[in-house]
């Protein structure tokens, strides 16, 4: 048999073997064409699982009369015209094979009208040569494509179709995926005359969360963590399954420039990000990556299910770091009791009068110094925690990105209804009794460093640059760093309490980190010391579970601080003084109130005050005056 050109019908049927696998493949190709045409509403009508009828109607730009015949021809497309267009493609379709392939294995009718035309036109192909006939029709601006009797002329393919229910399930599942990434489009899905899905346009965050609930289910949507991250030409957005959730989900959707793809790269990045945090083996996610189209090749799979990144390692590390940062931010959002907020704009406050300098206030700044975290209002209200990046590495082929921050991301705490009055649940909500007991524990007065009625007999020195106290002793002028005084008074307080043991505060959400193999023996060996610090640590399934911590560690990154402390125990057990200094350093990470530090300083013994005062730095002001006089 000699070489010859295949007839159009045969060539199209061969191509249909790759493009048209089942009715869901037809729906995918036609809906993507509607999206490329700029449609804002797409109605999908299915009969008998798609084997009898597939009808797609949109309000897009339509097809001009003179191009209808070309639309049903092979390798005819309006999406690109040159190789440069292919290398920067953003549309769903670009090969020009879908309509020709579908029409070769079905009875296809295409009706369309543009805004410039006064009437619509209808086209269909028939015969061995697939000649296209065009005739007038009635139709609004947009297009309607009817695919009747799919695989009617290829009985073998038709026999391999599953039941109507199974085939429709594939169509429904694909529509769910496209509905997530195109929240601005109104989709309807009808099967056997009954409306099954109605995805209304999601023009704001609450509406999109409703769509996410429709598609992914309420267990995923209620606990999902939002991700927003951007750096240069890369932007990652979407939702992650909560690391505290134990619900199994099949929500694993990844989009590149709006195109749903299957990619091992992102699956690996998600698993790696959740490695030390998630209780489920494969967490759910809905992630959308926007990237420069020149940096990704979408023309590598017959059905366009896969893509190839030009710098895959860079993209992998970008996604990994973005997800890790989002999870770390989420881990810091802990429930805390309600208290009023104050403006902590200035690091230190100098009182206007001597008496007002020593009035202790129950504010957030004082609580920071006393080791009590009373910033509950920040957690009780829905909020967004932003994570900002600074210097970012440039793209380098084959080089892993070492930065731990790739942009800004947010983890909203709002409820699905849009209310900002209560926090979103992460797993099981605690009982009201537990919450009340927890809040009462955090406000236990025994954690105060001093009696609130105590009034110092010495006036507080003047403050220089918000960081130093200025002391005068005759002709001597010296500066004492307030932070060092706070550290000394706090460590003295902690060392005193260590003798009887610190009282641990239960975490509403225990923190879990991967455990080293010898940590179990470390916990047994130093069990007394751990209880003395008010810590409650257990190991389960190679995970270290942190259940209780002393008040001085509540503002710390527990997933980092506790493992580092356990590592130090491998060498030697620290002395009480060293433990007190370590706890004091961990607790003094935020705002420090100068009046409170002065109150604590005045309550120390004379000997300890002298030890602290010896750290003051003398200022050679006499020499400076002499130099000024000479000049």
Curated annotation (Swiss-Prot):
Residues 337-362, 400-429 are annotated as: Disordered. GO terms for cellular component: mismatch repair complex. Coiled coil: none annotated. GO terms for biological process: mismatch repair. Pfam families: DNA_mis_repair, HATPase_c_3, MutL_C. InterPro entries: DNA_mismatch_repair_CS, DNA_mismatch_repair_MutL, DNA_mismatch_S5_2-like, HATPase_C_sf, MutL/Mlh/PMS, MutL/Mlh/Pms-like, MutL_C, MutL_C_regsub. Keywords: DNA damage, DNA repair. GO terms for molecular function: ATP binding; ATP hydrolysis activity; ATP-dependent DNA damage sensor activity; mismatched DNA binding. The keyword DNA repair applies. This protein is involved in the repair of mismatches in DNA. It is required for dam-dependent methyl-directed DNA mismatch repair. May act as a 'molecular matchmaker', a protein that promotes the formation of a stable complex between two or more DNA-binding proteins in an ATP-dependent manner without itself being part of a final effector complex. Belongs to the DNA mismatch repair MutL/HexB family. This is DNA mismatch repair protein MutL. It comes from Shewanella oneidensis (strain ATCC 700550 / JCM 31522 / CIP 106686 / LMG 19005 / NCIMB 14063 / MR-1).
């Amino acid at each position: 048999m000699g070489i010859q050109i295949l007839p159009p019908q045969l060539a199209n049927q061969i191509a249909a073997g790759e493009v048209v696998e089942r009715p869901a493949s037809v729906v995918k190709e036609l809906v993507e064409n509607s999206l490329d045409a700029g449609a804002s509403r797409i109605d999908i009508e299915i009969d008998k699982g798609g084997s009898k009828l597939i009808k797609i109607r949109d309000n897009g730009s339509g097809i001009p009369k003179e191009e209808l015949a070309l639309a049903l021809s092979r390798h005819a497309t309006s999406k690109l015209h040159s190789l440069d267009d292919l290398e920067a493609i953003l549309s769903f379709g670009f090969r020009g094979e879908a309509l020709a392939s579908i029409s070769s294995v079905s009875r296809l009718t295409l009706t369309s009208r543009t805004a410039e035309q006064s009437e619509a036109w209808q086209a269909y192909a028939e015969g061995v040569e697939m000649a296209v006939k065009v005739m007038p029709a009635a139709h609004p601006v947009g297009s309607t494509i009817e695919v009747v009797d799919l695989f009617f002329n290829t009985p073998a393919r038709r026999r391999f179709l599953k039941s109507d229910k199974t085939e429709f399930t594939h169509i429904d599942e694909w529509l769910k995926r496209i509905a997530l990434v195109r929240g601005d489009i109104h989709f309807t899905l009808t099967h056997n005359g009954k409306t099954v899905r109605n995805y209304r346009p999601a023009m704001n965050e609450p509406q999109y969360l409703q769509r996410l609930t429709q598609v992914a289910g309420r267990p995923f949507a209620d606990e999902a963590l939002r991700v927003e991250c951007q750096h240069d030409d890369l932007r990652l957005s979407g939702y992650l399954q909560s690391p505290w959730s134990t619900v199994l989900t099949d929500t694993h959707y990844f989009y590149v420039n709006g195109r749903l793809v299957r990619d091992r790269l992102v699956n690996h990045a998600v698993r790696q990000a959740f490695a030390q945090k998630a209780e489920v083996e494969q967490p759910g996610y809905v992630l959308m990556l926007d990237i420069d189209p020149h940096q990704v090749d979408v023309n590598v799979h017959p059905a366009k299910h896969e893509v190839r990144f030009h710098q895959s390692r860079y993209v992998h590390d970008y996604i990994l770091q973005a997800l890790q940062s989002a999870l770390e931010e989420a881990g810091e959002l802990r429930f805390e009791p309600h208290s009023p907020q104050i403006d902590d704009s200035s690091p230190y406050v100098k009182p206007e009068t001597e008496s007002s300098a020593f009035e202790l206030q129950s504010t957030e700044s004082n609580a920071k110094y006393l080791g009590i975290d009373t910033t509950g209002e920040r957690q009780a209200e829905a909020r967004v925690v932003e994570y900002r990046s600074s210097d970012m590495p440039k793209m380098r082929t084959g080089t892993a990105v070492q930065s731990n921050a790739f942009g800004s991301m947010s983890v909203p705490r709002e409820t699905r209804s849009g209310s900002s009055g209560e926090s979103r649940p992460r797993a099981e909500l605690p009982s009201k009794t537990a919450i009340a007991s927890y809040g009462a524990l955090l406000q236990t007065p025994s954690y105060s460093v001093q009696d609130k009625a105590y009034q110092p007999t010495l006036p507080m020195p003047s403050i220089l640059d918000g960081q130093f106290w200025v002391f005068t002793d005759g002709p001597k002028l010296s500066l004492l760093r307030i932070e060092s005084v706070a550290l000394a008074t706090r460590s003295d307080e902690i060392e005193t309490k260590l003798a009887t043991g610190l009282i641990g505060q239960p975490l509403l959400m225990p923190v879990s980190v991967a455990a080293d193999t010898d940590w179990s023996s470390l916990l047994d060996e130093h069990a007394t010391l751990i209880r003395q610090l008010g810590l409650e640590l257990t190991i389960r399934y190679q995970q270290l579970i942190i259940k209780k911590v002393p008040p001085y560690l509540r503002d710390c990154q527990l997933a980092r601080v506790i493992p580092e402390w356990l590592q130090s125990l491998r060498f030697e057990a620290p002395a009480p003084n060293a433990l007190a200094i370590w706890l004091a350093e961990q607790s003094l990470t935020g705002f420090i109130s100068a009046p409170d530090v002065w109150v604590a300083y005045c309550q120390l013994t004379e000997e300890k005050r002298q030890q602290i005062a010896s750290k003051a730095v003398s200022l050679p002001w006499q020499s400076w005056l002499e130099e000024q006089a000479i000049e």
